[in-house]
């Protein structure tokens, strides 16, 4: 497994294509949510893109956003593993690496996420707690969650 954590400007054209393709595959096609997948947050100079490759195939991805971009705190979004890579513990490795990267980039900062409601217990396992009621985003139940003062795992 090859891991890369890069700002937008350091992504290769192949990495950019790969991450946009898997995001559309998962969030637009698989979850049947026809919405604009691209936004200005990807290009923010402090946004970090965390990519995991297995044999030159992008199998997991998320982005780390600095405070003030989507939440007042640091945030993690667009968390995904590709279909054939699921059920192998890759999501846990991805989130652990994300928390470590956030600690390096923004030491001891609180982290917020807009989690799909059915993943609440998963994120609780990392110390996140619900901070909102359930709400619909693109017709999918979500809940805001927070990890106070992220620590290296």
Language model: regions and residue ranges:
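Short amphipathic alpha-helix that is part of the acyltransferase structural core
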Residues: 1-57
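A short beta-turn/loop motif at secondary-structure boundaries
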Residues: 39-44, 68, 136-137
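Conserved beta-strand in the GNAT
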Residues: 51, 57-66, 73-75, 80
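A conserved beta-turn-beta hairpin within the catalytic core of GNAT-like acetyltransferases
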Residues: 67-76, 86, 105-109, 139-141
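Conserved acetyl-CoA-binding loop-helix of GNAT-fold acetyltransferases
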Residues: 81, 87-100
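Conserved GNAT acetyl-CoA-binding A-motif
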Residues: 95, 102-116
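Conserved catalytic-core motifs of GNAT/GCN5-like acyltransferases
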Residues: 112-114, 124, 129-144
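Generic C-terminal helix-cap and adjacent flexible tail
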Residues: 148-153
């Amino acid at each position: 497994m090859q891991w890369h954590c890069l700002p937008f400007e350091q992504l290769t054209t192949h990495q950019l294509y790969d991450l946009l393709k898997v995001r559309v595959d998962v969030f637009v096609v698989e979850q049947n949510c026809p919405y604009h997948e691209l936004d200005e947050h990807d290009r923010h100079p402090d946004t970090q893109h965390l990519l995991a490759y297995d044999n030159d195939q992008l199998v997991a991805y998320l982005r780390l956003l600095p405070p003030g971009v989507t939440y007042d705190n640091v945030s993690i979004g667009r968390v995904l593993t590709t279909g054939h890579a699921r059920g192998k513990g890759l999501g846990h490795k991805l989130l652990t690496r994300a928390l470590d990267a956030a600690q390096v980039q923004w030491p001891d900062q609180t982290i917020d996420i807009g989690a799909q409601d059915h993943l609440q217990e998963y994120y609780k396992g990392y110390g996140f707690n619900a901070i909102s009621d359930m709400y619909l985003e693109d017709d999918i139940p979500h809940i805001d969650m927070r990890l106070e003062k992220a620590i290296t795992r």
